[in-house]
Amino acid sequence: KIADKPVVQYQEGVEGIKTLYLQSLESTTEVISILDLDSFEIGEIKDFVSGCARIRKKKQIKERSLVLDTPIARERFKEMFHEEQFAQCRWIDPSKLPGIVGFGGMLSVFEDKAMVTIIPRPGQAGMVIESTILTTLLKGLFDLAWDVGRSIGVPPLHQV
């Protein structure tokens, strides 16, 4: 077997994004994410995502996040996440990922699912792709990026 046949779920709007995102609360594996927090200006999404992070913590679902390092992201990070979560998050220099700058959402990988959410209006949407091959590849790429990520406690890039 060369590849598994992916299963794709697609939802539009804030409620659709929430419906897809809830799947990560049932994960039996670590949840890894790349976040463009600049796009989290919508209070409803911001509050929902930070609430889900608290629920995953209570359920002891491990989580690691790479966050694009911008001044807006640093402010939103403080608003959305509790201090004990900081150790499992790292900043990524956006200039090292020019193709991802401004993508406007989040990529999360858990179990055999890859979830992409696009948050800015118009065009709010999300999709979950179930594919072992895709998630194995994304997990490997995430680990490479994790190794070059900077600790959440470090000063912003423009102050280094």
What are these regions (language model features)?
Residues K1-S65:
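PLD-like (HKD) phosphodiesterase/transphosphatidyltransferase domain
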Residues K1, Q9, K46-V160:
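PLD/PLD-like phosphodiesterase catalytic module centered on the HKD motif
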